[in-house]
Amino acid sequence: YYMIQETMTVGDFLLFTLLLSEVNPPFDAGNDGNLLLARVDKLLEFGALDPAAALLDQAGPEDPALFRRWFDVSLLIGREDAACMTMQSNPKITLSLPARIFCLARQGDWNAAALTLNSAEAIAALSDEELALLRHFLESELPNEKEALPSPITPLVFKLTEAVGEPLPTFGLPLAFSVTDI
């Protein structure tokens, strides 16, 4: 993230410095974690994945909102196995079927991943785009034509397209995705 600092305006640099500061939340901030989530979101906007990961690691991914961000950051920095193990040890932490299917497959349980995908399709729990991408990921068959991608592009969609041999260019995506180009 030192390259990021060189291209920042003075105001952004000061904000970035504040985001990295070790501080206690204000007394009237409550215990909902919104300040931490805002800090992490802004770090991700700056493309500073390592500091965001450090904040999330320190807080722990026990809260669903924290886990979602921790999972996304883990995918972008190549720690998807740790994220999937955390999800497996605490299945209530996420309701994201695509993430569950991805992790089941990553951990080698292809049958459970396929069963989960088929169940999600039967109850119409996923969009057509998500179904097509996950089916392509699980079945490793080449699609007849270019499938539309789910919108917006999430770190999971980004990782799935990479896994099927069709990586997305990072141009036009949020800055956090560009870490994969380095």
Segment roles from a protein language model:
Residues Y1-I182:
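Alpha-helical solenoid repeat scaffolds
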